[in-house]
């Protein structure tokens, strides 16, 4: 019989919880009950109610609806939230309306369902003779809370936290080395079975450092580098770029000198062979033939060996100088047949048949 009743009631309970969650989370409305002392309702952070001037009414139990006692405004000058007192008894009903009176948000449940406890305070850390650490703090004024203690070595990363949890406000963390330094932090978490799924844990306390047997200076031996001391990236990049450019220029000049030293200078053929490219378009055979045709004829070896005779000067006996020039064979006197030869003063004349003398 009990199983049948559970099967019938379970879907209804789940549907009611889903409906309540849907009403509570509808739009951009957030409800938080801070340490069961005040209830904070905020809206307008999203697109549904951004810029809208909304009004809130509330009541506990079946009393009359009351207006919000204290609004806070956004930067645009419109309402964005309300602070109202929390009561541990009775159901809290919230009604949020727009300027025309239309309902935009409504919820009715205990204020503790939106509980967010305050962080633990006056946290004390003590080493035990066994090498463990006892963490203690004052208890909250209400029940239904679990506490979490996280620890890590001082130089570990953010994700290196190890958790120890329990229902009391006095927890012992074991497995530690007294010669090392550790960081601790604590928070309180409402139990879902006691307050519901919309309750949320408190903020973490500030990190407390425990040095143990080590000196306090050893805990801060290797602090994280300050961002202000980091070298500026832009000047460093510009300096590296300038250095790289200068190195490339020097390498190019040195490479050119090495190339000039290793490779001989090749003369320009257009200066040594005029007309080779202008007239013959690089045809060396045609250029040679043209150069031979325009060159003066060279002397043969026979002409170089030929000796030309020179005329001699003949000194006659009477002291007069006579220049004897050889005559060509066509001008040598030939005596015609039948002529008489006459010699006068050493000169010979030939007398022809007509009586004239021929010298």
Swiss-Prot record:
Residues 312-336 are annotated as: Disordered. The WSXWS motif appears to be necessary for proper protein folding and thereby efficient intracellular transport and cell-surface receptor binding. The box 1 motif is required for JAK interaction and/or activation. PROSITE patterns: FN3. Disulfide bonds join 68-82, 168-169, 181-219. The chain crosses the membrane at residues 233-253. Induction: Up-regulated in the myeloid 32D cell line by granulocyte colony-stimulating factor (G-CSF). The TSLP receptor is a heterodimer of CRLF2 and IL7R. Binding of TSLP to CRLF2/TSLPR is a mechanistic prerequisite for recruitment of IL7R to the high-affinity ternary complex. The lineage of its organism: Eukaryota, Metazoa, Chordata, Craniata, Vertebrata. Residues 254-359 are cytoplasmic. GO terms for cellular component: external side of plasma membrane; extracellular region. Keywords: Cell membrane, Disulfide bond, Glycoprotein, Membrane, Receptor, Secreted, Signal, Transmembrane, Transmembrane helix. This is Cytokine receptor-like factor 2. The keyword Thylakoid does not apply. GO terms for biological process: inflammatory response. A motif (Box 1 motif) lies at residues 262-270. High level of expression in liver, lung and testis. Also expressed in heart, brain, spleen, thymus and bone marrow. Highly expressed in progenitors and myeloid cells. Isoform 2 is expressed in primary hemotopoietic cells.
């Amino acid at each position: 019989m009990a199983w049948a009743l559970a099967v019938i009631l379970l879907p209804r309970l789940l549907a009611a919880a889903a409906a309540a969650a849907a009403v509570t989370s509808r739009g951009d409305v957030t409800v938080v009950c801070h340490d069961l002392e005040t209830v904070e309702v905020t809206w307008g952070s999203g697109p549904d109610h951004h810029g809208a001037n909304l009004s809130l009414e509330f009541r506990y139990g079946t009393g009359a609806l009351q207006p919000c006692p204290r609004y806070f405004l956004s930067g645009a000058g419109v309402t964005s939230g309300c602070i109202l007192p929390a009561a541990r008894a009775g159901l809290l009903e919230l009604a949020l309306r727009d300027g025309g009176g239309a309902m935009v948000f409504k919820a009715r449940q205990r204020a503790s369902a939106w509980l967010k406890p305050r962080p633990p305070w006056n946290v004390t850390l003590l080493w035990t003779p066994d090498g463990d650490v006892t963490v203690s703090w004052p208890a909250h004024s209400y029940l239904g809370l679990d506490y979490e203690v996280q620890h890590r070595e001082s130089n570990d990363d953010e994700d290196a936290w190890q958790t120890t949890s329990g229902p009391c406000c006095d927890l012992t963390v074991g497995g530690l080395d007294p010669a090392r330094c550790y960081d601790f932090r604590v928070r309180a978490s409402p139990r879902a079975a006691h307050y519901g799924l919309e309750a949320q844990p408190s903020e973490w306390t500030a990190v407390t450092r425990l040095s143990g047997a080590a000196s306090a200076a050893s805990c801060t031996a290797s602090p994280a580098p300050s961002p202000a001391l980091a070298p500026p990236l832009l000047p460093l990049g510009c300096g590296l770029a300038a250095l790289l450019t200068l190195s490339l220029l020097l390498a190019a000049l040195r490479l050119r000198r090495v190339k000039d030293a290793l490779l001989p200078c090749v003369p320009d053929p257009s200066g040594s062979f005029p007309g080779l490219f202008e007239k013959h378009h690089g045809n060396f055979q045609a250029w040679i033939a043209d150069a031979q045709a325009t060159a003066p004829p060279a002397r043969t070896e026979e002409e170089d060996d030929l000796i030309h005779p020179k005329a001699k000067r003949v000194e006659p006996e009477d002291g007069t100088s006579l220049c004897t020039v050889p005559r060509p064979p066509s001008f040598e006197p030939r005596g015609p047949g039948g002529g008489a030869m006459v010699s006068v003063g050493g000169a010979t004349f030939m007398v022809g048949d007509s009586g004239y003398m021929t010298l």
